[in-house]
Amino acid sequence: VLSPADKNNVKACWEKIGGHGAAYGAEALERMFLSFPTTKTYFPHFDLSHGSAQVQGHGKKVADALANAAAHVDDLPSALSALSDLHAHKLRVDPVNFKLLSHCLLVTLAAHHPAEFTPAVHASLDKFLASVSTVLTSKYR
């Protein structure tokens, strides 16, 4: 459960990310594809090369979804309901992949904002991404 301090850290982090969200999302996806090659199987139609328009576009979708989740941190199930349906019923993404992408997002954010990525912020973002992952996998049955 996210504490009030966690929620403040998450919102402050997303404000700091600002217009860089799409680039960070794409970078995190690239990290995931390189570090965990099995994740590529969900994107057979994508050009997965560095800087490809498709990876950039999906990175923006990831960033936009997380920004929406951060803005609605008190009601993640409602904010992410459509995405949960999509990933569970249509895309059938293995739930472990959300953890892998979350890890890559944390690495990306730490690399770009080392001064702000304190242990408390790291813990808050980790809890937030775990909560998002839990909601996204809640309809897997």
UniProtKB/Swiss-Prot annotation:
Residues modified to N6-acetyllysine: 16
Residue sites binding O2 per the record: 58
Tissue distribution: Red blood cells.
Name of one Pfam family that matches: Globin
PTM annotation (Phosphothreonine): residues: 108, 134, 137
GO CC aspect terms: blood microparticle; haptoglobin-hemoglobin complex; hemoglobin complex
Record bears the keyword Transport: yes
Modified residues (Phosphotyrosine): 24
InterPro entries xref list: Globin (IPR000971), Globin-like_sf (IPR009050), Globin/Proto (IPR012292), Hemoglobin_a-typ (IPR002338), Hemoglobin_oxygen_transport (IPR050056), Hemoglobin_pi (IPR002339)
Family membership: Belongs to the globin family.
Subunit text: Heterotetramer of two alpha chains and two beta chains.
Name of the protein described by the UniProt record: Hemoglobin subunit alpha
Phylogenetic lineage: Eukaryota, Metazoa, Chordata, Craniata, Vertebrata
